[in-house]
């Protein structure tokens, strides 16, 4: 069916008539699920913003007001809180799937995806601070102070973000505005990510590169994406039965600038990076290692190699990389004491070693098998 409207024609080409391989599995649902969760987070977050007050004296109490006084406010708050965890679960599955199938060969898709990941981490951190609880307040103090390692301008940048000489109500307003606006920038980059992907196709080893052996995206894969409904049902049930199991008990205590928690721990989806940061006693080197834990994957897109040799070795190393990431996440929430202070540097070295080994295999496979 021909559509004359240019906007509808664009949407039709992306969601209906897009030529798609017959062999894509359910692991290709992660992207569509991420899009659904992103929209879900924007909707629930907008509702919460109606009642939230970005003031250091009222922020914590307005969160309690939403929970206890606003009609169905507790549902929106619980779903928004757990929706962030659901988003990161599928985001990490999406990234690991990309490593598994060497998706970094699609340079624009890979680079835009990593940029989305960095922005989402910033977005989640700022949302975490908005509760203005004891743990989130001190997490804001620790993380923002890391910017002071930037040569020359570092202390000035920290003072500018804090709007003073410490994390205050002005910092809270700054984070609230960015937390409200950043999702729209993420949506824009997601659109670019989608366009780049659909203009080149997938990197699955089963992928068919001729349009003669493909099917339209709808209804074949629209129906397959309907399996996401099962995930949503599980998410709703778990959120209602265990609403705060993924949080910290300190998040129920109002922020006290005069007393820090015994053990500062970020949300679970930042723990692997936090473990790498703590593994290095030097502040500057720790921040560099923290950044490189993510920035390293940008280097994959700089290699001009479109072959897919050594795929079995690549998949084996990806599984080892996933295991090391999970162990680092566990170490990130452990106390700073033996044996964890020994294990964290060890698994940080393994993490980077596997990442650069994957990069090295990707670089050399073309030379070995050309």
Curated annotation (Swiss-Prot):
Heme b b562 binds at residues 80, 179. Its cofactor is heme b. It is found in: Mitochondrion inner membrane. The chain crosses the membrane at residues 30-50, 74-96, 109-129, 175-195, 221-240, 284-304, 316-336, 342-362. It comes from the Eukaryota. A ubiquinone binds at residue 198. It is a multi-pass membrane protein. Changing residue 222 to T: In strain: ED3092 and ED3101. GO terms for cellular component: membrane; mitochondrial inner membrane; respiratory chain complex III. Changing residue 234 to F: In strain: ED3092 and ED3101. Changing residue 342 to F: In strain: BW287, EG4181, EG4207A, HK104, HK105, JU403, JU439, JU516, JU725, JU793, PB800 and PB826. Its main location: mitochondrion. Gene3D superfamilies: Cytochrome Bc1 Complex, Chain C. One of its GO terms (molecular function) is metal ion binding. The main subunits of complex b-c1 are: cytochrome b, cytochrome c1 and the Rieske protein. Component of the ubiquinol-cytochrome c reductase complex (complex III or cytochrome b-c1 complex) that is part of the mitochondrial respiratory chain. The b-c1 complex mediates electron transfer from ubiquinol to cytochrome c. Contributes to the generation of a proton gradient across the mitochondrial membrane that is then used for ATP synthesis. This is Cytochrome b. It comes from Caenorhabditis briggsae. The gene is ctb-1.
């Amino acid at each position: 069916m021909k559509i004359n409207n240019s906007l509808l024609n664009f949407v039709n080409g992306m969601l209906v008539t897009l030529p798609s391989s017959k062999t894509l599995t359910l692991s290709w649902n992660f992207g569509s699920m991420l899009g659904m969760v992103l929209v879900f987070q924007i909707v629930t977050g907008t509702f919460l913003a109606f009642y939230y007050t970005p003031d250091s004296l009222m922020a914590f109490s307005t969160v309690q007001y939403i929970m206890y006084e606003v009609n169905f406010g507790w549902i929106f708050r619980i779903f928004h809180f757990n929706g962030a965890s659901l988003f990161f679960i599928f985001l990490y599955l999406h990234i690991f799937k990309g490593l598994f199938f060497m998706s970094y060969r699609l340079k624009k898709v890979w680079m835009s995806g990593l940029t989305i990941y960095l922005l989402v981490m910033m977005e989640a951190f700022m949302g975490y601070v908005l509760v203005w609880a004891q743990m989130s307040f001190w997490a804001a103090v620790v993380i923002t102070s890391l910017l002071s390692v930037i040569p020359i301008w570092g202390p000035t940048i920290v003072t500018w973000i804090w709007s003073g000489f410490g994390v205050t109500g002005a910092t809270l307003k700054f984070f609230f505005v960015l937390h409200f606006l950043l999702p729209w920038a993420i949506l824009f980059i997601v659109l670019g990510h989608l366009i780049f992907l659909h203009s080149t196709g997938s990197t699955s080893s089963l992928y068919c590169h001729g349009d003669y052996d493909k099917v339209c995206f709808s209804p074949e894969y629209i129906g397959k994406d309907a399996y996401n409904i099962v995930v949503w049902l599980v998410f709703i049930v778990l959120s209602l039965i265990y609403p705060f199991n993924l949080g910290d008990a300190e998040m129920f205590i109002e922020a006290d600038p005069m007393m820090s928690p015994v053990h500062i721990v970020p949300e679970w989806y930042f723990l692997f990076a936090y473990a790498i940061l703590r593994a290095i006693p030097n502040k500057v080197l720790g921040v560099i290692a923290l950044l490189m834990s993510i920035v390293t994957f940008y280097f994959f897109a700089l290699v001009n190699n479109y072959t897919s040799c050594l795929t079995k070795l690549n998949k084996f190393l990806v599984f080892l990389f996933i295991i090391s990431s999970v162990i680092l996440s566990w170490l990130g929430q452990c106390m700073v004491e033996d044996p964890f202070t020994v294990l964290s540097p060890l698994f940080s070295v393994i993490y980077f070693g596997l990442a650069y080994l994957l990069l090295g295999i990707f670089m050399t496979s073309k030379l070995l098998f050309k």
